[in-house]
UniProtKB/Swiss-Prot annotation:
It comes from the Eukaryota. One of its GO terms (molecular function) is zinc ion binding. A zinc finger (C2H2-type) spans 299-322. InterPro entries: Znf_C2H2_type. The keyword Zinc applies. This is Zinc finger C2H2 protein ECU10_0150. Keywords: Metal-binding, Zinc, Zinc-finger.
Amino acid sequence: MDTKGSLADKIDIFFLLKQQKLITKKELGMLLPTQSYEDYRVNYYRRRVPEVFDRNFRKEWFIYRYLDDFFCEERRKAIWNIYSFKIEGPCIIARNISDDVPGSVINSAFSQCVNLERFWIQHQTSQNGFSRLCYIILKKEASVQESIDFMRSVLDRKLGIELEEFDISGVVEPKILSDCNDYDTAMSIFSSMCRMFDINEEEVLKKYSSALGDTSTRQNTAEFICNALKNVFLYCYTCAHQYDDPLEMMMGCRNHKTTDAAARRREFLSSHQEFGYLDVKTKEEELNNMTTIVNENHYKCGFCGKAFESEKFIFNHFNNKHENEIRRIEKGIENFKKFICRIDCFVLGIIEGTDDDRIPKFILPNIKDDRVVYDMGAVFSGEIAIGK
């Protein structure tokens, strides 16, 4: 059975560009050998990045993480300070946080707790959907129950947020698995992360090396760079995930291992480029989309349906009668520009379709040359006989 031949008949570049999962250079070479991978990748992002933005820009979790300044500023500060994996105080977990709850509401409520050391909102996506949790780390001698009672008193009960103590005993700093052959990929990922967060690569490596207190440490090794990824960006080279807090990384990497899905994430991130090439529509282009040309000298407003004899008249109408809609368009353009400058590994996983470990089904038969794929319908029909 010629599996590759049957796939080639069904898959073209237009099919691939419509998918919600990016494929690797090797996979594209097996499916469409003459297709430029760079052209495919650029055009995939041109479609997919605005699509993810349009689907999420009104959602509170998205606003908190990518459009408000607080989260981004706090993360940049933490990166420059180099993360520590020492946790002394007890921990509380907040469950059942709807994605409609503004991050500012959560921030305001938990920040009032005098026993608070720090907290963060954890965002998770998977094939089962989107979820939010909040981990609250208290000061060393704090009373957990008193802290829970206080936070319950300041939270709106209608939100339905559940608070309980979370046991972190036995959680330790993760060990990153790497070998000498991983240096180039790890270094490329570190460079990508520096570009992503607008961090000077040389300066942050110098600061990290200084924080180690060991000037003899060899920086041109995979071990050094993989640990720098961990301590600077909370990025695990083994499972190829970035985390928002050291405790989250400690829990997420307890039983981690390298997988085909992790290798895909590493490959995409190692060649990551900024999205300055994306087309950001202007206000005039957006208004043109709201103009219907019925025929010559007949223009129709997409907001209210009113007709005009010329473009000049309809644009005057937009400015005079649809100020709110124009402000909304201008705000949308501003927010999209913010978003493409703040794309991180979390939303990159959504964009590239690597936020779960499923490999795209349409390339599965071609991943390994020695894999045998059977058409089970044909097997059971008797068309194919499997000998012993």
